Amino acid sequence: MRLRLFLAASALALLSGCAGLTSHEALEGQGDAQTWKTHKQQLSELDAWQIDGKVGIRAPRDSGSGTLFWLQRQGYYDIRLSGPLGRGAARLTGREGAVSLEVAGQGRYQAESPEALLEQQLGWRLPVSHLLWWVRGLPAPDSKSRLTLDADSRLARLEQDGWQIEYTRYAEQNGYWLPERLKLHGQDLDITLVIKDWQPRQLGR
């Protein structure tokens, strides 16, 4: 009887320790599941940030590099690229259901989703809605993902919806461990992000 109680208690402890892992996640690597759960919960509550950095893009028809500015305020985002692919400056702003893209020398375009807008105007198949999670070192919550953790129980590699994301460097900012360098590999698009300045915030508190 005591053995049964011990095994039952152990099973409950294990299940509670994995409660932060969704059924969409397959976890691999050398990290600890409980530590990842805590890290993931902290970053999930992060709903505002400002990012300055560099971006490199390789697409079938063109490639190049430029600077990145990203302002996030809960559901609203303002993402600015300058210099890549010889297009000058591009600015993507919006929230769910209403998105605008301004391209220097070309005009302003609108759509209901950032994915549709970027594919229509730039020819890029980029899951911007997933990027809101990936840039924090998290999987997007609504689809299946395969996670590889590093020795510090942070994401080293993420596979989700046909994309592979590699996280090669992290830094601590205001108590958050956030990616500083990541590479995204899609079917016909490769992106390298190097983040020089992270300013994370929580507005929902």
Curated annotation (Swiss-Prot):
Q: Which residues cross the membrane?
A: none
Name the membrane topology term: Lipid-anchor
**Record flagged with keyword Nucleus:** no
Give the InterPro entries listed for this entry. LolA/LolB/LppX, OM_lipoprot_LolB
Q: Residues with S-diacylglycerol cysteine lipidation? A: 18
| One Pfam family here | LolB
Q: Name one GO cellular component term.
A: cell outer membrane
Please provide the Gene Ontology terms (biological process) for this protein: lipoprotein localization to outer membrane; protein transport
| Keywords associated with the record | Cell outer membrane, Chaperone, Lipoprotein, Membrane, Palmitate, Protein transport, Signal, Transport
Asked if Lipoprotein is a keyword of the record, the answer is yes
Location in the cell reads: Cell outer membrane
The superkingdom of the source organism is Bacteria
Lipid-attached positions, N-palmitoyl cysteine:
18
Segment forming the signal sequence: 1-17
Subunit-structure text: Monomer.
Question: Tell me, what does this protein do in biology?
Answer: Plays a critical role in the incorporation of lipoproteins in the outer membrane after they are released by the LolA protein.
Q: Which family does it belong to?
A: Belongs to the LolB family.
| Listed name of the protein | Outer-membrane lipoprotein LolB
Q: Which organism is it from?
A: Pseudomonas paraeruginosa (strain DSM 24068 / PA7) (Pseudomonas aeruginosa (strain PA7))
Its taxonomic path starts at:
Bacteria, Pseudomonadati, Pseudomonadota, Gammaproteobacteria, Pseudomonadales
